Amino acid sequence: MEGDLAYIGAGLAGMGTGIAALGVGNVAANFLAGALRNPSAAASQTATLFIGIAFAEALGIFSFLVALLLMFAV
Amino acid sequence: MGKLVFYVALALVVVSGVLFAPEHAGLAIHPMDQFTVEALFGGAHVAWYTPTNVTLWMFLAIGAIFVLLVLGSANRGIVPSRAQSVAELAYGFIYKMVEDVAGKDAVKFFPYIMTLFMFIVTANFLGLIPMSFTTTSHFAVTGVLAVIVFVAITVTGFVLHGAKFLGLFWVSSAPLALRPVLALIEVISYFVRPVSLCIRLAGNIMAGHAVLKVFAGFAGALGFASFLPIFAISAFYALEVLVAFIQAYVFTILTCVYLKDALHPSH
């Protein structure tokens, strides 16, 4: 029974990766919107873009890790 | 000519998929098996000094970097050879990143950041070779890299600024009542940095490789249509090449951001 609950928890944690995808998409979409308005400033901001994506993505990876732990370690 | 080769390869894939379809359908491989650490020269016990496949692929990564950077630029041609121009591109790319993100006075840390980037990107790319082992997919490997970054940057901050480095946690632009709360949050976020550096890299690489192996495992379940997953695998492989580079880039650029905090801690 406990193992089954762990699988349910892993599935719930898997939702977190999808929600992090929303965040990454949000960062990229806003970057593109800004870049199209002022294309000359876009190239200097790609580093910021990647940092933003990395921070948004990290939390999704955390929930992926929780899912993995529930699947294989609990 | 190229088209012909492509069609012949495609036909070979389809025919071999039909010919060698397994008798009983089922997932042929477990997606996590590829990450098993094994002793190179036999023996089940793995101690901290045992040469394992991790050791082997790390040394291969170092060898590849040596060939690219040292041997590639040994001729120092005015007109660079292909290896030399790749080496110069990598050097210039990282140098510019350190200068832009961490500032001009961070350039003395450039050798360390260059080493970090080259090791991670080479280990990621070597891991994409079929049947190879991805060292950066292990939390132990990326954890050591992240902890070294964390310790080095904290020590740098304290050596350069002494107790003033703690001003990083004391947000002086915020209202006085909020500052203790913000300080707590800043301290937590400071100590989560190595964790997130470590988990971001290893998690991304491990997830990507596990996805590739999940699709490879479908081949066993599809019977004579077992050639189908190769299309998905090719698409994901291209994505993984991109991810391998971007994650190495993100690791180093975050190191530069943290380095900037250590060099200029004023909030």
Curated annotation (Swiss-Prot), chain A:
Mode of membrane association: Multi-pass membrane protein
Lineage, top-rank taxon, reads: Bacteria
Q: Which GO terms describe its cellular component?
A: plasma membrane; proton-transporting ATP synthase complex; proton-transporting two-sector ATPase complex, proton-transporting domain
- TM ranges are 5-25, 49-69
Site (Reversibly protonated during proton transport): which residue positions? E57
Give one GO molecular function term. Answer: lipid binding
Q: Which family does it belong to?
A: Belongs to the ATPase C chain family.
The alphabetical list of record keywords is: ATP synthesis, Cell inner membrane, Cell membrane, CF(0), Hydrogen ion transport, Ion transport, Lipid-binding, Membrane, Transmembrane, Transmembrane helix, Transport
Could you tell me where this protein is found in the cell?
Answer: Cell inner membrane
Q: How does it associate, per the subunit comment?
A: F-type ATPases have 2 components, F(1) - the catalytic core - and F(0) - the membrane proton channel. F(1) has five subunits: alpha(3), beta(3), gamma(1), delta(1), epsilon(1). F(0) has three main subunits: a(1), b(2) and c(10-14). The alpha and beta chains form an alternating ring which encloses part of the gamma chain. F(1) is attached to F(0) by a central stalk formed by the gamma and epsilon chains, while a peripheral stalk is formed by the delta and b chains.
> What's the name of the protein?
ATP synthase subunit c
